[in-house]
Amino acid sequence: MLVNMKDMLDNASRDGYAVMAVNSVNMEMVRAVIEAANEEHFPIIVQMGVGQMSKLAHADDIVPMVINMAERADVP
């Protein structure tokens, strides 16, 4: 599920848990990170740096795919 990051972090702060931001450099990593979050029932932040995006993938291509994968996830 795709959620507002501020809301997710506010919930984590209020309830006393951390949210891991995972630096993902390709779609295989994004898929693995989201699958692991689903299996563990914990929210995550999929992180991609501007430098990585400029060298490894174009934002116009990868952002819609990441959003689609996040929307299908069972966890934020």
For every predicted segment, state its role.
Residues 20-21, 53:
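Short, contiguous strand/loop micro-motifs
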Residues 7, 11, 32, 65-68:
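Alpha-helical scaffold segments in soluble metabolic enzymes
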Residues 3-4, 24-28, 57-64:
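Conserved active-site and cofactor/substrate-binding residues in soluble primary-metabolism enzymes
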Residues 39-76:
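Active-site cofactor/substrate anionic-group-binding motifs, chiefly glycine-
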Residues 23, 33:
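Conserved, mostly hydrophobic/aromatic
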Residues 29-31, 53:
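A broad, structure-centric signal for solvent-exposed, well-ordered loop/edge residues
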Residues 1-20, 39:
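N-terminal amphipathic alpha-helix/helix-capping segment at the start of soluble metabolic enzymes
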